[in-house]
């Protein structure tokens, strides 16, 4: 339990420090965030109310039509909560169930499975495990299907700049993948971000889902890889810029 408390403390401090730095400074110079001194003492409990402006507990409605399994992610979009579990389910801020988003299946308006999802004013976008992006409206109905430019892409996220430009992340499972991120619009590739090094594949391979964590702040796009100590931003030329060393 102490280890879990310490990890939560470090994660919380990192997130708050990162956003404070991002909000207060416009410099593009890479900064170092040093957590090493935090491990010298004992973990300390910090009330959530000291970190948040307000706290709300939302109990999600469940019934015969909606049974929540293992929750992989939640997305807050204006006055709605999107829950990614076995499916995608939409709730209002009180936890009342609104609808399911699409349905699983092999039909043209269905999805085979969900790699990840994101939202905008147009609706809910699902990166299907069948290597297509399915878009649904806020009533859960299918709108369109888009291709992706590279079949090895495992995660897709939109850029903060908008204009329907997306980034597709490729895990370096083989050890010799040439590029980690493809920047694309529709099926047209705009730029590629290369891997910095290769490695010899071992006898056993372990694959992690969501190996790349993207986020937006102040109109910019950032990403952090699981096995990389640097947080990068993506500039206007679609190139990675080191922003923080951890």
Describe each model-derived feature in a short phrase.
Residues 69-73, 111-116, 151-161, 202-212:
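Repeated scaffold domains used in trafficking and secretory/extracellular systems
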Residues 18-21:
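C-terminal motif of bacterial Sec signal peptides marking the signal peptidase cleavage site
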Residues 25-60:
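Blade/loop signatures of beta-propeller domains
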Residues 43, 52-87:
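Beta-strand-rich domains and repeat architectures in extracellular enzymes and scaffolds
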Residues 184-242:
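Loop-centered beta-sheet repeat module
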Residues 61-66, 70, 91, 96-129, ...:
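Blade-loop segments of beta-propeller domains
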Residues 34-36, 76-85, 122-128, 163-175, ...:
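Short beta-strand elements that form the blades of beta-propeller/WD-repeat-like
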Residues 56-66, 98-109, 141-147, 190-203, ...:
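A short beta-strand motif characteristic of beta-propeller blades
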């Amino acid at each position: 339990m102490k280890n879990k408390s310490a990890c939560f403390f470090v994660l919380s401090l990192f997130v708050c420090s990162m956003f404070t730095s991002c909000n207060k400074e416009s410099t593009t110079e890479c900064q170092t965030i040093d957590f090493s001194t935090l491990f010298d003492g004992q973990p300390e409990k910090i009330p959530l109310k000291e970190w948040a402006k307000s706290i709300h507990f939302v109990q999600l409605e469940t019934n015969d039509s909606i049974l929540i399994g293992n929750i992989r992610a939640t997305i807050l979009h204006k006055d709605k909560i999107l829950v990614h579990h076995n499916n995608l389910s939409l709730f209002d801020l009180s936890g009342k169930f609104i609808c399911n988003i699409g349905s699983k299946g092999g039909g043209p308006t269905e999805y085979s499975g969900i790699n990840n999802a994101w939202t905008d004013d147009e609706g809910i976008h699902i990166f299907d495990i069948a290597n297509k992006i399915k878009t649904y409206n806020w009533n859960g109905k299918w709108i369109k299907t888009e291709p992706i430019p590279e079949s090895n892409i495992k995660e897709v996220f939109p850029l903060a700049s908008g204009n329907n430009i997306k980034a597709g992340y490729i895990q370096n499972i083989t050890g010799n993948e040439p590029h980690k991120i493809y920047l694309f619009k529709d099926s047209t590739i705009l730029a590629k971000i290369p891997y910095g090094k290769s490695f010899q594949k071992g006898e056993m391979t372990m694959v992690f889902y969501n190996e790349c964590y993207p986020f937006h702040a102040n109109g910019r796009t950032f990403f952090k890889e699981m096995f990389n100590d640097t947080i990068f931003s993506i500039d206007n030329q679609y190139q990675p810029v080191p922003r923080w060393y951890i």
